[in-house]
């Protein structure tokens, strides 16, 4: 599943091709995504995309009269191609542009979404209750300590709650907790302020490095130019259950926590 770094890499890839460009046509070959693509998406035609932004794992194509909201779901990807490029299997939607390019949504598993809102995007039901972005100053040690106060929830599950902080998905929660030396099952409210500060710093570092490396390609993700992400080569624990810890050589433990695969070092993480 594309997580925050992969979505940000996609945003960076498509933004130069879309920003300041008028939409000339929207082609919906099959609108049966997570939610049906609404007919109102045709309102995008003849509008100029002024900005391509991201909120959590949603991409926002902003115009003066509304915003198209894109989500890549489990296996979705976006490609910028020349108009007239033949569609292939699972190419569900094209947004054609006045510069001769098109933005193509491919989604084999159909858990993605393309929606339209005339209201401010931040007021949309999907976005209104989201927590802060992890790479902004709003996500800091004081904020996390206040949110964690009195919480018995396992810290990994706590971090993956998008009302606490957005975009810390399974891969990056595993990696940040390992880097911070915190056991994923430790109660969020039982972690010292100092250790929470370390955790915040590691979340920011891991996410920023993943974006720099182009994301993490496991099965489905490629960036807007079709290239894979290379952060997979930097993974310390995710996908390495049963293999030696790079620091102490203890075999890494793998458990299910919050219905997600969780990998950690029982020696290095307390």
UniProtKB/Swiss-Prot annotation:
A zinc finger (FPG-type) spans 236-270. Pfam families: Fapy_DNA_glyco (PF01149), H2TH (PF06831), zf-FPG_IleRS (PF06827). InterPro entries: DNA_glyclase/AP_lyase_DNA-bd (IPR015886), DNA_glyclase_Znf_dom_DNA_BS (IPR015887), Formamido-pyr_DNA_Glyclase (IPR020629), FPG_cat (IPR012319), MutM-like_N-ter (IPR035937), Ribosomal_uS13-like_H2TH (IPR010979), Znf_DNA_glyclase/AP_lyase (IPR000214), Znf_FPG/IleRS (IPR010663). Keywords: DNA damage, DNA repair, DNA-binding, Glycosidase, Hydrolase, Lyase, Metal-binding, Multifunctional enzyme, Zinc, Zinc-finger. GO terms for biological process: base-excision repair. Its EC number is 3.2.2.23, 4.2.99.18. DNA binds at residues 90, 109, 151. It catalyses: Hydrolysis of DNA containing ring-opened 7-methylguanine residues, releasing 2,6-diamino-4-hydroxy-5-(N-methyl)formamidopyrimidine; 2'-deoxyribonucleotide-(2'-deoxyribose 5'-phosphate)-2'-deoxyribonucleotide-DNA = a 3'-end 2'-deoxyribonucleotide-(2,3-dehydro-2,3-deoxyribose 5'-phosphate)-DNA + a 5'-end 5'-phospho-2'-deoxyribonucleoside-DNA + H(+). Its cofactor is Zn(2+). Binds 1 zinc ion per subunit. GO terms for molecular function: 8-oxo-7,8-dihydroguanine DNA N-glycosylase activity; class I DNA-(apurinic or apyrimidinic site) endonuclease activity; damaged DNA binding; zinc ion binding. The active site is at 2 (schiff-base intermediate with dna), 3 (proton donor), 57 (proton donor), 260 (proton donor). CDD domains: EcFpg-like_N. Monomer. NCBIfam families: fpg, PRK01103.1. Belongs to the FPG family. Involved in base excision repair of DNA damaged by oxidation or by mutagenic agents. Acts as a DNA glycosylase that recognizes and removes damaged bases. Has a preference for oxidized purines, such as 7,8-dihydro-8-oxoguanine (8-oxoG). Has AP (apurinic/apyrimidinic) lyase activity and introduces nicks in the DNA strand. Cleaves the DNA backbone by beta-delta elimination to generate a single-strand break at the site of the removed base with both 3'- and 5'-phosphates. This is Formamidopyrimidine-DNA glycosylase. It comes from Aeromonas hydrophila subsp. hydrophila (strain ATCC 7966 / DSM 30187 / BCRC 13018 / CCUG 14551 / JCM 1027 / KCTC 2358 / NCIMB 9240 / NCTC 8049). The gene is mutM.
């Amino acid at each position: 599943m594309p997580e925050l770094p992969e979505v940000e890499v996609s945003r960076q890839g498509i933004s130069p091709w879309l920003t300041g460009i008028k939409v000339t046509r929207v082609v919906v070959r099959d609108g049966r995504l997570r939610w049906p693509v609404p007919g109102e998406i045709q309102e995008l035609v003849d509008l100029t995309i002024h900005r391509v932004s991201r909120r959590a794992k949603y991409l926002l194509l902003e115009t003066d009269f509304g915003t198209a909201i894109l989500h890549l779901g489990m296996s979705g990807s976006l490609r910028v191609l020349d108009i007239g490029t033949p569609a292939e299997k699972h190419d569900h939607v094209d947004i054609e542009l006045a510069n001769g390019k098109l933005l193509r949504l491919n989604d084999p598993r159909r858990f993605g979404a393309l929606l339209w809102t005339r209201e401010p995007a931040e007021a949309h039901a999907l976005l209104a209750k989201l927590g802060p972005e992890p790479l902004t100053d709003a996500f800091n040690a004081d904020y996390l300590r206040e949110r964690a106060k009195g919480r018995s929830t396992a810290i990994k599950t706590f971090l993956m709650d998008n009302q606490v902080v957005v975009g810390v998905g399974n891969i990056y929660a595993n990696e940040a907790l390992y880097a911070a030396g915190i056991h994923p099952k430790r109660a969020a409210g039982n972690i010292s302020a100092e250790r929470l500060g370390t955790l915040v710093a590691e979340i920011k570092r891991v996410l920023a490095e993943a974006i720099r490396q182009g994301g993490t390609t496991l099965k489905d993700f490629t960036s807007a130019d079709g290239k894979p992400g290379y952060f997979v080569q930097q993974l310390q624990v995710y996908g390495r259950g049963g293999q030696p810890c790079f620091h102490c050589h203890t075999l890494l433990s793998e458990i299910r926590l919050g219905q997600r695969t969780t990998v950690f070092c029982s020696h290095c993480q307390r």
